[in-house]
Amino acid sequence: DVYKRQALRQPQIRYTYDFTDKLEASLALEYVEPSYTEGEFTKYINQRIPDIPVNVKYSFKNGSHLQAGAVLRNMYYKDEIEDKDRIVTGWGASLSGIWQFAQNTSLCFQGVYGKGISNYIQDISGTGLDLVPNATAEGKLKAFGAWGGYIGFSHNWSKVLTSNIMYS
């Protein structure tokens, strides 16, 4: 049931390096269970390789920032027709940021696209869309393409009152 899903924090080992006071980058190993739809001749098996997310963030003097990210993941499943463990590689890229264009007003945004990354997109996480059955090859799964994004404005009227409007 989609409404009973919960977002869980994933085990992760991450290294972040500050190149300057404005530029930082991070590289991680993250264990994310893929969520996929099994076909008639495919079966879930334990995952063996962690996801590899990377991020680069540039911060501006006024509190604004721009961040680019990417993830590479290998997802395992069992092809029961050929009795083989198979790997499908997924990938994703994102661009996000906050633009502080007035003292108390900011614009935030994010866009993401990839294949096999449904667990990284909140609205479709856990819905079986990392891998889906390949309609032209029994016993095979393929990475499902997904995209998402949002844009929003925030205004601080005072220290205790803020208004936000978002579109996703």
Language-model-detected regions and their locations in the chain:
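Internal metal/ion-chelating core segments
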Residues: 20-81
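Detector for outer-membrane/organellar transmembrane beta-barrel domains
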Residues: 59-168
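Glycine-/small-residue-rich "gating" segment that lines the acyl/pantetheine channel
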Residues: 14
